[in-house]
């Protein structure tokens, strides 16, 4: 359950968790592995009275990692690593009824880290790292039942115009209503895709009272990712002349600029959060140890997903209104013999979207239940095995004017790392 992440120096992955822990290594070590994420997230609901159910909205994924730690002197250690800092993906079918809220949402932030650590003496060590982050993002939404719903609004406005003697306006509104009513549900209303390199940093501090007791504090900086990419939708460009007129009549289309399927330049700034983590490690007996962690992530920086055109016009906007979130973890490790260490832990993970849930990122509060083991084949070669079961809290909420949804979630994580000490 990642308990003790900032205070436990089991393998070279400390490069990513707390670089100050690298001073615990007296020999060079290399670690490579990954985690298979097998998620089961289902959405049940309605939009405008139409069923909007979707199963398995989070595809399975493999999350890789690779780290190395190299002592340079008795006090100074270098390290480097590759890992996924942030990753999320949800995918609904392109004919999903609530496609304007839940289509395809994907973000992957691949982190390349170079760190150094120094033993300050008196039990203290400090570490600092630089991060080069390559981020890929893609957001796509579809019309779903939106075309028919907007068509009904336009027909009502057309009737009002006709009754007021405005025959030309009524005819135009009815014509647009007919086009929208006949648009397929898989019509793309927005698609933006881009990638970007960004820079960040991380730092850590540890205090070791003795070989049996250690505390750690780690910090990872916020990163502002300024994507430049391409935006498109499948609405005819002739609609651009109607957008302001329709908005003035109280009817809004799910686009702010029609592109007719052509790509136009677009940009999107994604504010990834900073986080703090405090951890402790205590060896109670020769065989048994306890570790714990508190992690605070500043998700409040992520207020919305907004894409802009070259002239500053809004191409896509989605409120997220994330809140800062906390995570609590407690774990135990048991040295069964010289070759085998067993581990178990639990964690409570607070959702960042608890105050503004959305089916695009169907997050909920969740519990972690974890088991793991380290097996040492030789004094230099070992393998870490881990399994976690995540169970999310059921979450019912409204989205937009007519969407009502309930999200149920669980996941199984399977991890394997191979470690070699030189």
Residue ranges, per PLM feature:
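Outer-membrane beta-barrel porins/channels
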Residues: 5-10, 48-52, 61-422
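Transmembrane beta-strand segments of Gram-negative outer membrane beta-barrel proteins
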Residues: 1, 23-42
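Glycine/alanine-rich phosphate-binding loops at beta-alpha junctions
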Residues: 43-44, 57
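Residues immediately flanking
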Residues: 19, 34, 82
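A general structural signal for short secondary-structure junctions and capping/turn motifs
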Residues: 21-23, 68
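N-terminal periplasmic accessory domains that precede
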Residues: 15-21
